[in-house]
Amino acid sequence: FEAEAKALTAKAQELMTRHAVDAAALHAGDDTDSELAPVAIRIPIDAPYTDAKSLLLQTVALASRCRSVHDPDLDLSTVVGFPDDVAVVEVLFTSLLVQAQTALTDAARHAPPGTRTRSQSYRSAFLLSYTHRIGDRLEEINQHVIDQATIDHGGSFLPVLRSRSDRVEDHMRAMFTTMTSKPVRGGYDRAGWASGQLAADRAAINLADLEQADPTTTGSPRPVKELT
C-alpha cells in the first residue's frame, strides 16, 4: 500500500497548497488580504518523546505556511498562522502522529525476540527519522504546486504569500518576545531510523481527513494515544 499512501498524501497536500495559492492569486494586486489576521492555537504534546513530537508539529506547520513554538514546561505547542492553514495543521499533525504510533506498536508486536523495538533509542530514532522524511515529502509536493501555479498565474500570487508569511512571523514574535532554539536530542538506532523512514513513506493523508479541518472548530485537538 506504500504507493497508494504516497498518492493519497500527495493529493491531499496539493489540495491544501493549491487552496492557499488560489487565495493568494485572488488577492494579488489589491489590499483586501491585508485585512486578514493570523490566529494562534495551542496543541498539547504528550510525553514521552515530546521533543520529537513537537518537531513533527513544527515540520507540518512550516509545510502549511504556519509557525510552531514549543513550551517544554507546559508540554504545549502554539501554532500561529491563518485560520484555514492552522486548521489543516491540526488535522495533519494528529493523523501523522497516530500513524507513527500505530507503526511503532506494530513493529513491537511483530519483532523477533530480543529486538529492541521498545527501547527509548529505537523509538526516538524512529520518530525523528519519520519527521525528517515527512518534511521531505511535504516540501516536494509544495514545490511542485508552486512551480505549476507560477506557470498558471505568472507568479502574481508570490508577493501575497510572502506578505502572509511575514505577518505570521510578526504575530509569532509579538506573542513570544523571547525564544530560543535547541537541537532535538535522541539516541541513534539504525533499525529505528530505517523503520521511521519506511513508516513515513507509507503514511497517508486522504481528502476525508481534510474535511475535518474546519477553521471554526480549530483549537480542540483530538486525543492521541500516548506511547509507552
PLM-predicted stretches and their roles:
Residues 21-228:
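Extended, helix-rich structural scaffolds rather than catalytic motifs
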Residues 5-19, 127-134:
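Short amphipathic alpha-helical coiled-coil/interface segments
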